[in-house]
Amino acid sequence: DDLFPVSDDHEIMDLTSFGFAAGTPLAEALDLDDIILEIDNKSMTNRPDLWGHYGIAREISALYDLPLAKIEAYTPPANVADFPIEIKDTDRCPRYIGVKLENLSVKASPFEMQSRIWRVGMRPINALVDVTNYVMLALGQPTHVFDADNISDGITVRRAESKEELLLLNGKTLELSNDDLVIADSESAVALAGVMGGAKDSVLDTTSNVILE
């Protein structure tokens, strides 16, 4: 419990596959003896390029003339599934990118990823959700996964209707105003843009098709 205080889960873990010798300290075996630097975001609110681990590494690389590992670019396959996206408020959202992934199975993330998410104070959920949080922490780019089977007729980026309600992932219901920007389908808002997703389209153990925002 002291190693993973932010997790509500309790389970027995078989450590045989890790291959370390008996007597190895648990923190060393599970790579939990690293150093964590906590940087107060108030000191760099004007530097969004530093809002991720890679940005901090790039800054340190520039200051101390150290080598910086490159991030490999990924080109999606040409046969990506078609999914309609419409932006109705281009002033507040000039660009929206999403890709549909089909026939997936929701599994637990690899232990290394879970461990890294734990260590920065977040809670692992499953591989699909964890990878979006992992990318956000690494690159400072928030992403989100929608259950595609619960999205009706594509994605629309629009202003919320006055007093429109949205049930968030954390169980809270918001009463929105026309100043709020939402991600919506043809029926209702499904996420508060740039803030939090809604419960309607959340990824569950039964999810097999997703929209990666």
Predicted regions and their residues:
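Short amphipathic beta-strand starts and helix->beta connectors
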Residues: 19-28, 82-86, 195-196
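Conserved mixed alpha/beta core segments that line enzyme active sites in large multi-domain catalysts
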Residues: 21, 132-205
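Catalytic cores of large soluble enzymes that bind and process phosphate-bearing ligands
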Residues: 27, 31, 42-52, 89, ...
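Glycine/proline-enriched, intrinsically flexible loops and inter-domain linkers
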Residues: 64, 68-164
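Structured core elements
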Residues: 36-40, 52, 59, 98-100, ...
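Phosphate-backbone binding interfaces of nucleic-acid-interacting proteins
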Residues: 1-77, 211
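A broadly conserved detector of short glycine/acidic/proline-rich loop/turn motifs that flank catalytic sites
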Residues: 2-4, 10, 19, 43, ...
